């Protein structure tokens, strides 16, 4: 996987094999029957999300978040069938192959399913991710919530700077106002439904109106309600959780759309704190929000797009506008990453 061009060629070929292979008749019939029932329950022509869910046998702590594809605003059986095939094929995305190799996972030991969910109309409201642990420090007495306008993929992929809220669990349990910190994100872009129903084109990214980007995308009441639901989920699974949520702009309700174990901070020793100090001094060229606590150094390589990935050598500092999971194959090479936006 160190040769990113060879990785891209191999991954593309494997994915095409999967897409070109017809469904088994039994599976196709089962999908049709289940989708017809789902449409009836939705009451009319509804939009659906076709999502991936991967797991590895005997590796419950393996994290496959963001590795496979999700398709949003999918309408009709034919479009759902197409999306399911592409979800299955995404088990061999470049980033997924690279991740498994770096983690030492057997490609044959990873299982993948496609889930079909009715869409929450967060394109008319907001959505985001919340953690039942502080992702920076590992402190377990807070719920950390991120929120931005539109469909949640923008937050999940790190494509926007979202609003951030910290809710203190013990205070929330006492029924008192518990939002202890809030940061206003820039929220410059949002993902909404597109009028183009071609595969992979059902959503589009547009600018957020100036007034909206300069106000919070959730009220404190909504933030605390989300935190309450996050605690219920955490208590059920008995471990810190990573949860995706969405607000429906039509009915005004908050929905939980996905929950999975938090697999980074919860693995670390909560009694140990690492601190790194830069001994040298020089003029500060630029500043920003840090993700993580370590110090990286190396030759800065400015990349205009993901197509230039092969320019990165081990130890380089990757500088680009934004990264998403597709950049995973070279993230292991870089000593540090600097971007204009995302998180």
Q: Which residues fall in each region the model found?
A:
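N-terminal beta-alpha lobe that positions the nucleotide/phosphoryl donor
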Residues: 1-115, 210-221, 225-229, 234-238, ...
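Conserved catalytic alpha/beta cores of large enzymes that bind or transform nucleotide phosphates
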Residues: 142-242, 247, 281-297, 305-308, ...
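Conserved metal-phosphate-binding beta-hairpin within the catalytic cores
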Residues: 66, 239-263
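Flexible loop/turn segments at secondary-structure boundaries
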Residues: 56-59, 123, 151-153, 249-255, ...
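Extended active-site and interfacial segments that coordinate phosphate-rich ligands
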Residues: 64-98, 123-197, 257-289, 333-341
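Feature captures the catalytic cores and cofactor-binding loops of soluble hydro-lyases/lyases
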Residues: 301-343
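Short, flexible loop/turn elements at secondary-structure junctions
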Residues: 54, 118-120, 149, 220, ...
């Amino acid at each position: 996987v160190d040769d990113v061009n060879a990785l891209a060629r191999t991954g593309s070929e494997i994915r095409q094999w999967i897409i070109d292979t017809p469904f088994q008749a039994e599976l196709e019939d089962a999908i049709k029957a289940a989708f017809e029932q789902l449409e009836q329950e939705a009451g009319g022509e509804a939009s659906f999300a076709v999502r991936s869910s991967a797991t590895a046998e005997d590796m419950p702590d393996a994290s496959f978040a963001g590795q496979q594809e999700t398709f949003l605003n999918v309408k009709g059986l034919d479009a759902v069938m197409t999306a399911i095939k592409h979800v299955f094929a995404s088990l061999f995305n470049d980033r997924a192959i690279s991740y498994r190799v770096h983690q030492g996972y057997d490609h044959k030991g990873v299982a993948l399913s496609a889930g079909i969910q009715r869409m929450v109309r967060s394109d008319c409201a907001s959505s985001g991710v919340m953690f039942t642990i502080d992702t920076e420090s590992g402190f377990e007495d807070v719920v950390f919530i991120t929120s931005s306008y539109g469909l949640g993929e923008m937050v999940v992929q790190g494509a926007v700077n979202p609003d951030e809220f910290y809710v203190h669990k013990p205070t929330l349990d006492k029924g008192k106002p518990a939002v202890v910190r809030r940061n206003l994100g820039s929220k410059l872009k949002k993902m909404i439904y597109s009028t183009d129903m071609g595969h992979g084109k059902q959503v589009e990214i547009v600018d957020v109106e100036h007034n909206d980007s300069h106000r919070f995308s959730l009220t404190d009441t909504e933030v605390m309600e989300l935190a309450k639901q996050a605690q219920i989920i955490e208590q059920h699974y008995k471990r810190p959780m990573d949860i995706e949520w969405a607000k429906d702009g039509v009915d005004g309700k908050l929905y939980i759309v996905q929950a999975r174990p938090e697999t980074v901070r919860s693995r670390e020793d909560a009694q140990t704190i690492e601190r790194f100090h830069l001994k040298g001094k020089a003029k500060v060229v630029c500043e920003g929000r840090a993700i993580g606590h370590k110090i990286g150094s190396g030759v800065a390589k400015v990349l205009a797009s993901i197509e230039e990935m092969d320019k990165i050598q081990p130890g380089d500092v990757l500088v680009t506008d934004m990264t998403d999971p597709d950049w995973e194959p070279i993230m292991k090479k870089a000593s540090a990453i600097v971007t204009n936006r995302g998180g």
